[in-house]
Amino acid sequence: MRKLLALPVFTLALAIPATAAPRREGNPELRYYADAYADHYGVPRALVRAIIAQESNWNPHALSNKGAAGLMQLMPATADLYLVRNRFSVEDNLSGGIEYLADLMTEFRGEMRLAVAAYYCGSRHIAQKGLNYRNPDVVSYVEAVRHRYQLELHERADRDIPMPGKGQ
């Protein structure tokens, strides 16, 4: 199930102090790792960033009252399934969380809304209900991630467009 990422860069123990304050858009090192794992598992970068922002606000030390932990807020059972040893490890959490998201994207044939809903509440529930899920928490979560996803797409487009008179 787990695919080893053969990039030497991932062997570094990301040196982010526990007291580092997360920023809404994420620390550049965290974004770098998130993008690299997104590329490795074939998941859109903007979707990964949107989920991380929604789940933990880019805080690798986040812990929910339900026991979800780390950047992608992995529950213990999901972490075990994806061989995540330390849910607070940036690399472990991103690798396991993004691989899980990639599996959900495959399970739901690329339908992002369903994959995001399943990321939030589990694939069994969404597989049974499909687009007919009515739980207000799930609907709200999917809408929040969709909004963040759109912001990520626009931010990326803004970065990719050269300023007039520069770089042309």
Language model: regions and residue ranges:
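Catalytic glycan-binding domains that act on GlcNAc-containing polysaccharides
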Residues: 21-168
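Sec/Tat signal peptide C-region and signal peptidase I cleavage site
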Residues: 16-20
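Bacterial N-terminal signal peptides
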Residues: 6-15
